[in-house]
């Protein structure tokens, strides 16, 4: 608490008070644009970026959109976990400038010496800031399993290098997915119990052995690209079974009247489905495991979390109105169009891609409109951050 007392008060614009304020709108705007740009390139209506099309697509969805969300979330959460003021002001401005520079570099400068710098400054700086917070204030950390982030965060640098490495693209993609999966496993474990307590007055049972096994298996599966096929399949199926078991005794059925909480469970079940599908050798249309995770887990959970955090952390009551629920509904349609319908009607694959891209973009455009006024204004309860 002493550290917070001597921290100078930020007197600049409210946008720079805490990490989610600049990065959630940036992530939402990126998510609204990226699928439409991708479909424009995919269909030949737009010029291709400097990187190979598939590499650019995967990089921007994970390291553009995904890391803006994860970075904003962790910059906000870590300060609360260790009870300090956290990074704000100039530090956030530098991060945003680096993120914007990376978007331009990925499109225009892929493969050039300048890209090696501009394409990595954001990730390196973000990791350094987050790890500094977790290591410097580990004695006041309320979550002793935050050592998982000390493992996961630096591995994003390895995963990104592999993703951009040409012949190692699939290794990098799978490592990246495993790292995001690990982050979502931890986030769901920490957020669902208080959400269920607040919405339904339910105290979810915590079984240490199961919780620990889930995180341990998720960490092991980060290294999927280097695991023997049989071991990967066994670990994936065991983790899927444990997650389904926990969702069952965490009363997933009770969430149906509350869409904003139900999508959290649905996102977790999509993660489980991704594990099961990736454990099999069956052939599916359109990189199914990757899109189960991107549309199912990231797509369903992130919009709900953005709204919840943008309202709750600006001093407002967390209530999802009709427009918020419309955004979540649009993402559910996008999920069906991208994941389910290509398996049912593969002849219309490109049409389903367009439907999915448009619904995803509409969802995040609406989310951007909803949260922008909140992050640009001071807290309504008089608190600083």
Task: Please identify what each model-predicted range represents.
Residues 1-385:
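Hydrophobic alpha-helical transmembrane segments of multi-pass integral membrane proteins
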């Amino acid at each position: 608490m002493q550290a917070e007392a001597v921290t100078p008060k930020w007197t600049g614009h409210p946008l720079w008070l805490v990490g989610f304020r600049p990065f959630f709108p940036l992530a939402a705007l990126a998510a609204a644009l990226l699928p439409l740009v991708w479909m424009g390139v995919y269909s030949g209506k737009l010029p291709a970026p400097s990187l190979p099309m598939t590499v650019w697509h995967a990089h921007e969805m994970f390291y553009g959109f995904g890391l803006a969300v994860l970075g904003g979330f962790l910059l906000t959460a870590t300060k609360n976990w260790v009870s300090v003021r956290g990074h704000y002001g100039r530090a956030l401005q530098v991060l945003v400038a680096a993120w914007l520079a990376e978007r331009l570099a990925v499109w225009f400068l892929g493969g050039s010496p300048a890209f090696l710098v501009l394409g990595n400054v954001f990730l390196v700086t973000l990791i350094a800031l987050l790890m500094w917070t977790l290591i410097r204030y580990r004695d006041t950390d309320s979550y002793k399993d935050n050592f998982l982030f000390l493992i996961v965060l630096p591995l994003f640098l390895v995963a990104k290098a592999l993703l951009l490495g040409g012949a190692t693209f699939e290794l990098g993609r799978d490592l990246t997915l495993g790292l995001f999966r690990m982050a979502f496993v931890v986030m769901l474990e920490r957020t669902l119990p208080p959400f269920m307590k607040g919405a339904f007055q339910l105290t979810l049972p915590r079984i240490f052995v199961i919780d620990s096994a889930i995180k341990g298996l998720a960490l092991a599966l980060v290294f999927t690209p280097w695991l023997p096929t049989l071991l990967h399949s066994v670990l994936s199926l065991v983790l899927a079974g444990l997650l389904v078991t926990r969702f069952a005794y965490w009363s997933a059925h009770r969430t149906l009247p509350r869409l904003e909480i139900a999508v959290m469970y649905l996102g977790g079940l999509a993660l489980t489905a991704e594990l099961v599908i990736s454990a099999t050798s069956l052939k599916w249309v359109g990189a199914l495991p990757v899109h189960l995770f991107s549309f199912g887990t990231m797509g369903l959970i992130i919009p709900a979390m953005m709204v919840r955090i943008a309202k709750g952390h600006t001093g407002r009551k967390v209530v999802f109105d009709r427009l918020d629920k419309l955004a979540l509904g649009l993402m559910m349609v996008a999920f069906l169009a991208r994941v389910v319908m290509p398996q049912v009607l593969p002849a219309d694959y490109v049409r389903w891609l367009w439907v999915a891209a448009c619904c995803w973009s509409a969802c995040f455009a609406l989310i951007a409109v909803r949260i922008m006024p909140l992050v640009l204004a001071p807290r309504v309860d008089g608190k600083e951050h």
